[in-house]
Every structure is written in structure tokens, then in C-alpha cells.
Amino acid sequence: MNIAEFHQNIDQIWDSIEEQLENQDIDADCERQGAVFTITFENRTQIVINKQEPLLELWLASKLGGFHFSYKNGDWLNYEGKRFWDCLAQACAAHGEEVSFA
């Protein structure tokens, strides 16, 4: 994956997150600032997702800790092989919102 493909892929992920939260009537605000995407829930807790361009990684930080994901075999996986979408759903649950990401 080159740099342009990396940014395009992450932008699609961020669009998908916003769309899925909205479609499931989740009370959360999404904000993009450069390489950082922040989800702020009604209880004012946050999940922060950011691009790490030099490493071509996607990072997720929440109450559950920090996770780093690399693009492998068509999916974003952490070093344990856990999918980004599954970790994001778990993070949302830890912040008080049950979300199903497809």
C-alpha cells in the first residue's frame, strides 16, 4: 500500500464509522482534525483514532488502552490478529454504547 492508498483507505474507514454510528442512532459526535479522528460520546468520554503515516498504521486509543493496526490480507489487524472493527466495537461498549460495525 502506498501513501495515497493509505490515506484513501483510512478516510473510507472514518466515513464508515460516522455512517454506522448515525445509522444506529448512537449519541456521539465525530470530529476530524488532520490525522486524528475523535468520537465523543454523550458522557463526554472519547475514542481517538489516528493515522500513523510513517508506519502505515491505524491507531486506536480508548478506555481499554491503545492499539496499533497494520493492513494485512485486506483487513486492519493488530499484532494479536484482532480486527480493527471488533476492537472499535469493544471500545464503544466500554464507553457505554453498543455498536455493531460491519
From Swiss-Prot:
An annotated GO cellular component: cytosol
InterPro entries associated with the record: CyaY, Frataxin/CyaY, Frataxin/CyaY_sf, Frataxin_CS
GO biological process terms on file: iron-sulfur cluster assembly
Keywords per UniProt: Iron, Metal-binding
Gene3D superfamilies: Frataxin/CyaY
GO terms of molecular function: ferric iron binding; ferrous iron binding
Any matching Pfam family: Frataxin_Cyay
Matching SUPFAM superfamilies: Frataxin/Nqo15-like
The keyword Metal-binding is annotated on this UniProt entry: yes
Keyword Metal-binding found: yes
Family: Belongs to the frataxin family.
Purpose: Involved in iron-sulfur (Fe-S) cluster assembly. May act as a regulator of Fe-S biogenesis.
UniProt protein name: Iron-sulfur cluster assembly protein CyaY
Organism: Mannheimia succiniciproducens (strain KCTC 0769BP / MBEL55E)
